Amino acid sequence: MESTLRSGGTTVEEVVLNLLSVNYNELVMAASGEAAEKALADTNAKEHILVVNGSIPLKDGGIYCTIGGKSAEQVLRESAENATMILAVGACAVFGSVQAAKPNPTGAVGVDEIIKDKQVINVSGCPPIGEVITASLAYILTHGKAPELDSEGRPLFAYGQRIHDSCPRRPHFDAGQYVRTFDDAGAREGWCLYDVGCKGPSTFSPCPILQWNLKAGWPIGAGHPCIGCTERDFYDRFTPFYQKLPTVPGFGVEATAEKIGLGLTGVVAAGVAVHAGVTAARAAADRKATKNSPMAAFGDAPTDSPSPSSTGQATEQNSEAK
């Protein structure tokens, strides 16, 4: 919601008051208490589009998040029953985000780990970009169906390309010009942040194009490396945040950044064009075809997760990764 409030184009006031019928949202609705719960129940009884924000904790019967005496899992199942479309908005709703990081003490999971019988559109990011949220809703309302999705359920129009492929600092990567420390000359000149931990080569997101706060800025533009927050289990796979990724895809093989950048001497212009085109094409194709496509990372995603019950009451299961 915070990100949506600061989106550009159509204002959130126009969206909420004139374009959409937002029957239940704790942050913008006037009702509270029993009146709010009645609004939710009335909406759940008929067809609707469900937008979910936040992870769902399953351990210990779901006691770590309760609303109106019901666990978050119960509320989700009831709300999803008559939903014609479901959007999981934000990294928490998509895969659990930081709450789901090992050892995941609350058993936090994303929406699509609970709702298996309906399509879930995953609008990932921490936070997600407001324009991607509103564009996804606009597409659904206009076409009556979900936009084309990648293998992880994310809209391809937004998540079809890596940050690395459209980053304004990409020419410095190709030229082998890297920030080595945050106070060096390269940092002042706006060089590539790969050496100080940027996860842009492994992260699919439109951040460089849309940015945040009416295009006022974004992390890399402010001099901070991308942490990969749109990618599943990023906190387990991409930490330490300020450590360089082991490898990045280049010229069809895994090559270090130094080999890609410094090895282009004499053929820079042609090589850069080929590298950018090939990696962009491979990125879109790989993400479209394969869930959890192999990308440079420090570790694997957690292997164990809590199991939601068929009755809406979470089972108690150790969610710590093996």
Give names to the regions the model predicted.
Residues M1-P206, G217-P219, T239, G263-R287:
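Iron-sulfur-associated redox domains of electron-transfer enzymes in respiratory
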Residues V75-R77, D112-K116, P249-A255, G299-P302, ...:
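Mid-to-C-terminal functional-domain signal that highlights helix-capping/loop sites
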Residues I227:
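Cys/His/Pro-rich metal-binding microdomains
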Residues E231:
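Short Cys/His-rich local motifs and their 1-3 flanking residues in nucleic-acid-associated proteins
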Residues Y235-D236:
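Short, non-ligating residues that shape and space the ligands of small metal-coordination modules
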Residues F251-T265:
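Juxtamembrane/start-of-transmembrane alpha-helix segments at the extracytoplasmic/lumenal side
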Residues A285-K322:
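Cytoplasmic C-terminal tails of single-pass
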